[in-house]
Amino acid sequence: MEARRSGNFESSIWDDDYIQSLTSSYTGKMYVDKSEKLKIEVKMMMDEATDELEQLELINDLQRLGISYHFKDGIAKMLNNIYKSDSKYMEKDLHLTALKFRLLRQHGYRVPQDVFSSFMDDEGNFEAWVVEDVSVLVSLYEASHISVEGESILDMAKDFSSHHLTEMVEQIGEACLAEQVKRTLELPLHWRVGRLEARWFVQAYETRPNSNPTLVELAKLDFNMVQAKYQDELKRCSRWYEETGLPEKMSFARHRLAECFLWSLGFIPDPHHGYSREIMTKIAVLITITDDIYDIYGALEELQEFTEAFERWDINSLDLLPEYMQICFLAIFNSANELGYQILRDQGLNIIPNLKRSWAELSRAYYLEARWFHNGFVPTTDQYLNTAWISISGPLLLSYGYLTTTNPINNKELKSLEKHPSIIRWPSMVLRLADDLGTSSEEIKRGDVSKSIQCYMNETGCCEGDARHHVKSLIEVALKRMNDEILMEKPFKSFDTNAMNLARISLCFYQYGDGFGKPHSDTIKNLVSLIVLPFHMP
């Protein structure tokens, strides 16, 4: 009998007793009424903002404060008017140009990179005066990250602004500005998780000399009210998890319910999508356990039977599996059928075949990687990535994300998503590569298939540092291709934001290592800030 391997995973600090103890006082009609009153005041502010720069900065603040979802129609109208207006980009106002460029592109307007040409000299370099204002450099740097492939001006803008901000950062006297520059250089705004950015930015914005107290009050109140909603969702997920018995039956696996909820929150943050967040949390838990079965615990012969069970999608053949696999498969089978029933009941559409195909595809990718490991085979980088962007579960997560946030579900869109278009492939690739950067060293020590870093080292003979640099360059390409997606007209335009968010939460979790499998202080801090601690309000 082949010895079972162990991942020696750390226990989660987020047990059910602690989760059920979470409370919030920010519920009830009093807070709803106060919020509605503040929203009316903000709408008046939007109506009164007539200057283009004033409008753009207000939109930017609303987005970063985490309250722009209340004003989607007003923001869309404002940006459309700005885009259609005859006003030219002010030739010597780089802050305005960069902010306008970034916001319009984020909202799907294909603004050309040439708008930055007027800030470049005859030799094609940015003019020397640009480096005199740190805030302007930050605006340029942020704008440069919403580029697509082949945009040399934006590539130059990123290199130029990054170089000078890195040189300046330690000499910046203003503490708030210095912190902003450090955060920007760590991860640009375009790729940050919105709710985490809001938590930080509310406090940063409040210290500004020109901050608006109405915006501060609404942002804090809204954050606290949404946090109360998140707490209720997490409690329900935790009760479900305990009732499944999975924590006891799957003691060899990572048990990361709270982290899975944080993942779902970053992926689908809008408060009105609570149902989707709960489904996504459950699916992320089941994916994690299944991954550990394939990567760590399962014998190769068992894994073949497990994969065939997903292909058959038939509970009558469960007896062919060992008990731990039966429990895992049945949990997945039941959860898929429950979602399928709800969508059939509410929308008259049978999505069970779609879910079956997605789980079978994931299991095949897991099994191929397990065979590679057991046979001591190191694939080429391309071979690895052709499977690994699926085995990271991105396509499955995005499929569930579409199904749980779309009503009515469009059959044409569903069939298109099954073919894994770019809006599925590139967020999944970012998730895979970010995961590899954060986890590969530990996973190789534990015993796992070679990741992109090891595959590239084996293929080229380079050192680990060079391989990591190469993987980062692949992430950059994937991010640019995702940017291109939001500027394209296609059938499932509304799906773009969730797809982009999958990449954002991936970068967040693996920014400082394995923030999921081996939760570190940043993951704990993020959970506490979003789920546990409200803003203090008088």
Curated annotation (Swiss-Prot):
Annotated protein name in UniProt: Exo-alpha-bergamotene synthase
Field pH dependence: Optimum pH is 8.0.
Pfam families: Terpene_synth, Terpene_synth_C
InterPro entries named in the record: Isoprenoid_synthase_dom_sf, Terpene_cyclase-like_1_C, Terpene_cyclase_plant_C1, Terpene_synth_N, Terpene_synth_N_sf, Terpene_synthase-like, Terpene_synthase_metal-bd, Terpenoid_cyclase/PrenylTrfase
Segments carrying motif DDXXD motif: 291-295
Enzyme nomenclature, EC number: 4.2.3.81
Family: Belongs to the terpene synthase family.
Residues where Mg(2+) 3 binds: D435, T439, E443
Function comment: Catalyzes a mixture of sesquiterpenoids from (2E,6E)-farnesyl diphosphate. Catalyzes the formation of exo-alpha-bergamotene, as well as (E)-nerolidol, (Z)-alpha-bisabolene, (E)-beta-farnesene and beta-sesquiphellandrene. Also has activity towards geranyl diphosphate, but to a much lesser extent.
Residue sites binding Mg(2+) 1 per the record: D291, D295
One GO term of the biological process aspect: diterpenoid biosynthetic process
EC category name: lyase
GO molecular function: magnesium ion binding; terpene synthase activity
Cofactor info, note text: Binds 3 Mg(2+) or Mn(2+) ions per subunit.
Keyword terms: Lyase, Magnesium, Manganese, Metal-binding
Reactions catalysed according to its record: (2E,6E)-farnesyl diphosphate = (1S,5S,6R)-alpha-bergamotene + diphosphate
CDD domains (alphabetical): Terpene_cyclase_plant_C1 (cd00684)
Cofactor(s) needed by this chain: Mg(2+); Mn(2+)
Residues the entry annotates as binding Mg(2+) 2: D291, D295
